[in-house]
């Protein structure tokens, strides 16, 4: 039997005593722990990418620092990655609204653990037309030092509504980037919102949203054991599977996020619309291979006519997973444990 075999009884128990508002207002929040122990939380607020710091393990948060602002429109979808050399990269999606500036994936860097920031590189440039844009960057660093940056990309499909998941590689700590490579594409559909995770067996998975089964999105896992050297995983690829073992047919699986616990379990979150007027964040527990997700739990209490948007997950320690969501008027976080 696998060391981390998941049963129907596994779920997350959320500790309401840990519930904290990180920021009043704001959206698309993500957390990392930097060397030294502080936690950083990045999020979008009034079109800018901001970062707040916690020195007490997420109980309280210092005043926000502005990392990036777009010349037109917004600096959206911020996501952080601490590199092996100690730098912290913040990736964001420049979303213009003037018909002049391009949609881009930009990178900012902090060399002092998130205290000060400067622009680092332009990773990708798409069109000025929002129908041919690029969206939602997220990244990992391999043990070799290679950075892999994933994002949703309409730009290669100017004559259709299709979208792929694109990979860029950097071998110099994010200063320069490779040519784009498609790693996931279902013809005629829209793969979106990728979140990568390096598993304990050194393979890589990417949680994405996929509207290939119905007009609603479902969460899919795309997998590689050869560092994405194969053609993109299409709708029939064995390297691509539905995440939820027993999906609810009417469940909208937007905005996925995935992490792996030190004990091996994979934790998956996404936005669910089941029994609601607007979606909320739900969380499932999977096995060590990012399969067989079960044990649906709801970390935040949100009125059914209000939304819980753009959730994420943070492995706080060996036994604690933190859920973060934009709900109830702000960016909220809560700790949970597998039971």
Please describe what each predicted stretch is.
Residues 4-339:
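Asp-box/BNR beta-propeller blade signature and adjacent active/binding-site loops
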